[in-house]
Amino acid sequence: MEPLQQQQQQQQQQQKQPHLAPLQMDAREKQGQQMREAQFLYAQKLVTQPTLLSATAGRPSGSTPLGPLARVPPTAAVAQVFERGNMNSEPEEEDGGLEDEDGDDEVAEVAEKETQAASKYFHVQKVARQDPRVAPMSNLLPAPGLPPHGQQAKEDHTKDASKASPSVSTAGQPNWNLDEQLKQNGGLAWSDDADGGRGREISRDFAKLYELDGDPERKEFLDDLFVFMQKRGTPINRIPIMAKQILDLYMLYKLVTEKGGLVEIINKKIWREITKGLNLPTSITSAAFTLRTQYMKYLYAYECEKKALSSPAELQAAIDGNRREGRRPSYSSSLFGYSPAAATAAAAAGAPALLSPPKIRFPILGLGSSSGTNTSSPRISPATTLRKGDGAPVTTVPVPNRLAVPVTLASQQAGTRTAALEQLRERLESGEPAEKKASRLSEEEQRLVQQAFQRNFFSMARQLPMKIRINGRAEDRAEASAAALNLTTSSIGSINMSVDIDGTTYAGVLFAQKPVVHLITGSAPQSLGSSASSSSSSHCSPSPTSSRGTPSAEPSTSWSL
């Protein structure tokens, strides 16, 4: 019997369950419908109240933010309300599906609780719209059963606080800064800088600039400068740093204007005084260039506006002139001058000079040997000898102390060179094209180099030997004084030479050669292609001249230098 009774009870329970299921479904549907209607009515109220949005945009910086839905457009608010309703209804549906043995009373109680929670939530939001002071409490204490709304309200509140704090912090600065920055950046002047430490560093630099000294004109100047640069369209967003310290814009402007302005400083090149006035270390490389660029960027426009000490065209001309002076070679007499000691030192060091004197070897005369052992003295010792033929006896005959070189030639060359340099400088400064300047400069340099070589050769010729030894009989000084050596130049590569010995004049042309310069005088006619040629003497002796190596009673006419 007992098994039969148990089966009957199970069948009755199964028959009751289909009747309970429709009741639970009806209760859930009613509950959802009520929630949707309430949410729709609330969203409709938000749409019909545009004054709330305008109040949010125009509220003062110190006021408390409104509710989270007051900061979003109406369509977004409706979407958020429906999403929250769906999120709140899903957990309750899951809980309701698990109830099998509860009756209609439990379902009704659950529905009443949810409607009360929803009505309480809507009531709190309505009060928040009417009185903004209740908004923080509603954000911190949300309605039960609605945790997502509480989290979002907290996040929105912190965002609003972060947006409001920069406006409060910048309220102590001049009004132009806040207003103009808001106009340019769309109301978010310092929000990007406030995210990191960069904004704090910039604000500290501005504060330090105001507090560098107690000069009462400093604050007035800086305020005026910042306002001027802001109106000009080039605001000063950061303070320049030089030598790991803030560049004092006020003192820099004061020092430069006291000296006459930026153009005057560039022309006079007195940046060292400015550096000392700013208490900058003297070891800074390119301090003048750095100060000039910073002044042009931050202060030159202000100088032109307030004091009009110069114009941008004058500034550009001063910069170009300074650049030309830095690159222009220094044309001076020392560049083309011949100094035997300097030439000897340069040759010993092995460093090629730009306009070094031509290297002509005189191994026999003692001006220099191939080994370079006798280059210390440019003059020839009295013991220097000339060779006659091969192994013939040698005697000494003195010659006048100086060569017959015109003195006026050097002065004429110096005057010509000075005039050429002045003409070249005028052409360079006249604004010709760069190609013409370069070609003209190269031509002038070549011409000056040739003149320098010629003048150096004359200087070297003046230091030629004091005595010449001639094979033959020895004369005393009275007779030797009659001998003369004339030296003239026909071109840069040859020298006309004439020697008068015992009434006989020997003339010839000397050509420059690297190893040794030879002078050979004989009966052969003058030859231009040979290393040295000679012309016949103007007053020949009765006896014919002998060839090389042939002894004769007359003085030998075969010479070798």
Swiss-Prot record:
Signal peptide residues on this chain, from the entry's feature table: none
Protein's gene: ARID3B
Name of the protein in question: AT-rich interactive domain-containing protein 3B
Expression across tissues: Expressed in placenta, testis and leukocytes. Expressed in neuroblastoma.
Protein keywords: Acetylation, DNA-binding, Methylation, Nucleus, Phosphoprotein, Transcription, Transcription regulation, Tumor suppressor
Function field: Transcription factor which may be involved in neuroblastoma growth and malignant transformation. Favors nuclear targeting of ARID3A.
Family matches, as Gene3D superfamilies: ARID DNA-binding domain
Composition bias type Low complexity, residue spans: 1-17, 523-552
Compositionally biased residues, Polar residues: 164-178
GO CC list: nucleoplasm; nucleus
Region (Disordered): 1-36, 53-122, 136-179, 370-397, 523-561
One Pfam family hit: ARID
